[in-house]
């Protein structure tokens, strides 16, 4: 009598099941799992928060053994339009990447610009190499009287009324850096008064004193109205 042989069916592993088992056994390299639902809104908010101005883009060629190798450089000005501004210089094989690098460098070079009623507190002169830029305060409604490179820096800094003059070199990079050097020389009136040992009223511009007087009157009126409302 022949012996009966019972065969047990073995599970067949498909490629998909093998990949799933492998993912369960082996963690991702780096120890962190990618979250497909992560919030990317912060990037868009960061981009919309700042003003970006591409001042100039240059193409640079390098001769190598196999021929010419091209790359691009971008000079970018970034600011919040409220007294914060920075300048960056990016280099890359593609234009968008060069601009992106310039923006990141500009954010690392941020500095604060003192302002008085949308203009600058006092005249300044900035120099960079052979480029010279003169900046002078202007009355309200004058606008930005400046060329392209200087205008880009001033608008990103939030200065809307100013007179400017560029002398010497017409190189765009020199003009931008001369403008930045001039803005970095600006001082608050209170800092100037403290350094010279003078009264604030003697140093501060008359326009600034008028603005501060109106602000103080408005604050006093609001405080008085609040006190009367509480008493009633």
Swiss-Prot record:
UniProt entry tagged with the keyword Secreted: no
A family per Pfam: Ribosomal_S5
Cellular component GO terms held in the UniProt record: small ribosomal subunit
GO molecular function: rRNA binding; structural constituent of ribosome
Gene Ontology process terms (BP): translation
UniProt entry keywords in alphabetical sequence: Ribonucleoprotein, Ribosomal protein, RNA-binding, rRNA-binding
Chain intervals with Polar residues compositional bias: 7-19
Region entry Disordered, spans: 1-47
SUPFAM superfamilies in alphabetical order: dsRNA-binding domain-like, Ribosomal protein S5 domain 2-like
Name of the protein described by the UniProt record: Small ribosomal subunit protein uS5
Family: Belongs to the universal ribosomal protein uS5 family.
NCBIfam families: rpsE_bact
Record HAMAP family: Ribosomal_uS5_B
PANTHER family according to UniProt: MITOCHONDRIAL RIBOSOMAL PROTEIN S5
Primary role: With S4 and S12 plays an important role in translational accuracy. Located at the back of the 30S subunit body where it stabilizes the conformation of the head with respect to the body.
Keyword RNA-binding: yes
Start and end residues of each S5 DRBM domain: 50-113
Assembly behavior: Part of the 30S ribosomal subunit. Contacts proteins S4 and S8.
Written domain comment of the UniProt record: The N-terminal domain interacts with the head of the 30S subunit; the C-terminal domain interacts with the body and contacts protein S4. The interaction surface between S4 and S5 is involved in control of translational fidelity.
Biased composition (Basic and acidic residues): 20-47
InterPro entries in UniProt: Ribosomal_Su5_D2-typ_SF, Ribosomal_uS5, Ribosomal_uS5_bac-type, Ribosomal_uS5_C, Ribosomal_uS5_N, Ribosomal_uS5_N_CS, Ribsml_uS5_D2-typ_fold_subgr
